Curated annotation (Swiss-Prot):
Renumbered residue ranges of the record's region Disordered: 150-169, 210-233
Domain of life from the UniProt record: Eukaryota
Gene Ontology biological process terms in this record: maturation of SSU-rRNA from tricistronic rRNA transcript (SSU-rRNA, 5.8S rRNA, LSU-rRNA)
Protein name: rRNA-processing protein EFG1
Subcellular location: Nucleus, Nucleolus
Keywords annotated in UniProt: Coiled coil, Nucleus, rRNA processing
Family designation: Belongs to the EFG1 family.
Organism: Scheffersomyces stipitis (strain ATCC 58785 / CBS 6054 / NBRC 10063 / NRRL Y-11545)
Pfam families assigned: Efg1
Cited function: Involved in rRNA processing.
One cellular component (GO) term of this entry: nucleolus
Main location: nucleus
Coiled coil: 53-130, 160-188
Amino acid sequence: MPPKAAKGKRRPNGASIEVAGVLGGGASRLKKKIRDIERLLKKDKLPADVRTENERAVKALKVELQNTQFNLKAKQVAKKYHMVRFFEKKKAVRKLKQANKNLEDISKTDVRKDIKKARKQVKHCEIDLAYVIMFPKSEKYISLYPNPKENDEVDVSNPKAKKGMQMTEQRRREFRKEIEQLIENNRLPFTIGEVLQGKTVKIEFEGQNVAADHEIDAPEPKNNQQEEDDFFE
């Protein structure tokens, strides 16, 4: 938090250290206040204590500006992709439930090979579900279930387009790996059970508390109507 000062309190040489009034007021007000303080700091004859206090204030304001810009970007990106994430979460939940049911049925057979394979599938589905929820809200969402037609439309003979596809696939694999490690180390900020119960979860990204979209974490409808598995395939 930036240092607070009493309203209207003036410093020597007319320097004002009021910053509380701009907190929460948006990026424009923060930028203006930062410029004002930086202009003040350019003055040669500025008392040492005033300079120190203003330097601290401008540092705090820059952090606040970064937070504000981060949250604004996160909201814009989340809004753009919230429907894709919503349907992908529902699909991931459905696939996990199917995998759990399959494991339960296979476990009754005592066939170790089949049980091992079923457990592996459950783990895969858990990673997918956590991926959808944990994917940073400030990034363009990379779908787990991309439409094959979209990939077919990409001109692979175009080096730029081909590189874009490769980078997208690399990011998808890298983030799935991160999620897998979080699950293995029991470091997910929620449990898979909570998600299956429809509970809302909040995720931290880079020190920011970014709440998962309500649509993504909303409880599933009570009707049991099955959606086609190829909705996003």
